[in-house]
């Protein structure tokens, strides 16, 4: 029997000093949660195209999906299976990390203060060559745990498959409840036999995991970069993507050295090189795009190539600052991303989008550039669209029920409450997140991950990192 308004008090769970009150009972079965759950007593930052904010609103979730968001509807309340009083929290869509490397999470802090090329060739790739399936799985759990606890509900990732059972790692990711794309990186390294095996592995992985974990997880075709893949490997990547109707995910135009190297090898800059090879015939996510000219931006727009902007990683590796304002002005879809924590060194998307906004203002010497609404959209709705997951990223009817909660009342840096939109960009931090829901299921409660054994993963992380030679 549905509760009346007085009985809503019976639905307040898990009081805590950090996150206030108002949680769904995590002992409730998933089937019960997915019947008709109504969330009330909250401010909803929808991140729809109109950037609507609904104060004291109501959101209905059925079958993993938002079926209604708006003002109170007494009839809907009367028909609810569950009512969750959110205790006045701020609710926003889960954040979307458009480019990451979770398998590398164990490498946090290794190889600081290095440029990209020596960092990859003398630190990252040699250590990754020692990875086992156990290391890759634990590292992925650690990365996803950090992502979810700081508000990320969707990610797009590339991993080095060398020496690991990629399917087993994907199974581990599926158990966390995370949404996203986990992509098998294609390299032209080693012998010709090694390269053929890599391509075969990537194609098989793409077929096996195109729709996985009840549709929450997928994969993309991921040639590493124009400098780490031969033209033949790029063309094979394009074929695999086309035949399996998959997106492409690739590092492009990240450094000045890359531009000069590709021009020397192939007679054209990276974007034109990839266009000639047919890679952009499938929807493509281009990580970085730091070094681009107007002609290249026109090519990206023409082929609907999307860009994953990684401001902190690009700064840390000394690669430069991408001109995101020009990308947006050209009509190119852009999402915010952290890259891997080996070059960031965290997965805090609040910090990432704030840095993105401040860099554009400083680069243009114009405080009107890159307003809060744009930066927040790039980390939610626009980011989701950029990686081909437009079914999430905003709080709208028909979208997946991926959302996060913040309890602002005991946080000095989120006062005064009247300027909440500004605070979400310029003041909020990942550790302000209280609860995280993916597909309508709570995966983080009061800042604790419900789907991953936190203590075990942290202990295993430190044990396993000690087995690696640096």
Pin down the residues of each PLM region.
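N-terminal metal-binding scaffold of metallo-dependent hydrolase/deaminase domains
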Residues: 10-12, 20-23, 28-77
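Metal-coordinating catalytic core of metallo-dependent amide/deamination hydrolases
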Residues: 164-290, 295
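Alpha-helical scaffold segments that flank or form the walls of functional sites
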Residues: 108-178, 201-212, 462-470
């Amino acid at each position: 029997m549905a509760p009346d308004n007085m009985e809503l008090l019976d639905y307040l769970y898990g009081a805590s000093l950090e996150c206030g009150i108002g949680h769904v009972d995590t002992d409730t079965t998933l089937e019960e949660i997915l019947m008709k759950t109504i969330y009330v007593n909250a401010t909803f930052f929808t991140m729809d195209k109109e950037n609507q904010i609904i104060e004291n609103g109501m959101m209905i979730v059925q079958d993993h999906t938002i079926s209604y968001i708006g003002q109170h509807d007494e009839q809907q309340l009367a028909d609810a299976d569950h009512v969750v009083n959110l205790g006045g929290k701020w609710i926003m869509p889960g954040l979307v990390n458009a480019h990451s490397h979770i398998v590398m999470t164990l490498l946090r802090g290794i190889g600081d203060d290095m440029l990209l090329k020596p960092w990859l060739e003398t630190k990252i790739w040699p250590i990754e060559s020692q990875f086992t399936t156990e290391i890759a799985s634990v590292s992925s759990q650690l990365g996803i745990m950090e992502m979810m606890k700081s508000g990320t509900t969707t990610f797009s990732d590339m991993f080095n498959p060398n020496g690991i059972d990629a399917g087993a790692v994907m199974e581990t990711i599926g158990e966390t409840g995370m949404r996203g794309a986990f992509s098998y990186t294609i390299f032209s390294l080693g012998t010709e036999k090694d390269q053929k095996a890599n391509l075969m592995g990537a194609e098989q992985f793409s077929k096996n995991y195109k729709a996985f974990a009840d549709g929450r997880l997928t994969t993309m075709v991921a040639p590493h970069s124009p400098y780490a893949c031969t033209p033949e490997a790029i063309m094979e990547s394009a074929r695999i993507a086309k035949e399996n109707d998959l997106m492409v995910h690739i590092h492009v135009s990240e450094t000045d050295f890359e531009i000069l190297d590709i021009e020397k090898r192939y007679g054209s800059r990276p974007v034109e090189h990839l266009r000639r090879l047919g890679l952009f015939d499938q929807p493509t996510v281009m990580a970085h795009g730091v070094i681009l000219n107007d002609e290249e931006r026109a090519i990206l727009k023409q082929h609907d190539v999307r860009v994953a902007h990684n401001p902190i990683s690009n700064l840390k590796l000394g690669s430069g600052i991408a001109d995101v304002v020009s990308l947006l002005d050209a009509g190119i879809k852009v999402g915010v991303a952290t890259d891997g924590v080996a070059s960031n060194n965290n997965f805090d998307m609040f910090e990432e989008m704030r840095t993105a906004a401040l860099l554009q203002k400083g680069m243009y010497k114009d405080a009107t550039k890159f307003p809060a609404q744009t930066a927040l959209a790039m980390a939610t709705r626009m980011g989701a669209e950029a990686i081909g997951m437009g079914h999430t990223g905003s709080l709208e009817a028909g979208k997946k029920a991926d959302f996060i909660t913040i309890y602002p009342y005991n946080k000095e840096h989120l006062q005064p409450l009247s300027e909440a939109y500004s605070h979400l960009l310029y003041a909020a931090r990942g550790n302000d997140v209280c609860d995280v829901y993916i597909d309508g299921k709570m995966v983080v409660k009061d800042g604790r991950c419900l789907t991953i054994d936190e203590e075990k993963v942290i202990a295993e992380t430190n044990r396993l990192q000690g087995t690696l030679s640096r």
